């Protein structure tokens, strides 16, 4: 039972595209026993879906809209904390494989609670101790990774520019699968 998490920064002018890509990704990956947790964030944090079976996690236009500044670190920190609290209630053998997909437009960071250093430490800990697979996609992701103290815990990253975000996720997952088989 795998869990797919999407932390997705609001992208002005690309709302319809994001909704279509998200729903297509779910449809293409909907075979299997997967649960989806979807987090939308900007200057607010919206836990849209929590552990919802993949077939019921579609995104609709009234759910996805642009508001204010992006609090990327706060959204990632809250998502990790929320999922850890859920996993702590499960026996270790029952904890699902977790994939964290973070989409960001590379814009401002209005976070108030978490710092960049705190987030990189949390991400590395989740990957090292809990086996999470963590993927970044967005604008200027490589620059963000280069600025990190370490990014050993990141399983994939790619700048998207105008590429299909979820197509990039599929490629990252495929590369990850192939590297594990070698």
Regions found by a protein language model. Give the residues of each.
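Acidic, low-complexity intrinsically disordered regions
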Residues: 1-182
């Amino acid at each position: 039972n795998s869990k797919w998490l999407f932390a997705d920064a609001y992208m002005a002018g690309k709302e319809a595209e994001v909704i279509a890509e998200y729903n297509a990704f779910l449809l293409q990956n909907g075979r299997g026993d997967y649960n989806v947790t979807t987090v939308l964030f900007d200057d607010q944090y919206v836990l849209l879906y929590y552990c919802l079976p993949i077939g019921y996690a579609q995104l609709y236009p009234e759910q996805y809209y642009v508001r204010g500044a992006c609090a990327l670190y706060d959204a990632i920190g809250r998502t990790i904390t929320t999922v850890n609290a859920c996993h702590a209630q499960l026996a270790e053998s029952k904890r699902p494989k977790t994939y964290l997909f973070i989409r960001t437009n590379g814009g401002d960071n209005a976070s108030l609670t978490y710092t960049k250093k705190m987030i990189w430490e949390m991400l590395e800990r989740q990957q090292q101790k809990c086996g999470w697979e963590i993927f970044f996609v967005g604008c200027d992701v490589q620059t963000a990774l280069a600025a990190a103290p370490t990014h050993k815990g990141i399983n994939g990253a790619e700048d998207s520019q105008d590429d299909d975000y979820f197509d990039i996720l599929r490629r990252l997952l495929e590369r990850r699968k192939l590297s594990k088989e070698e």
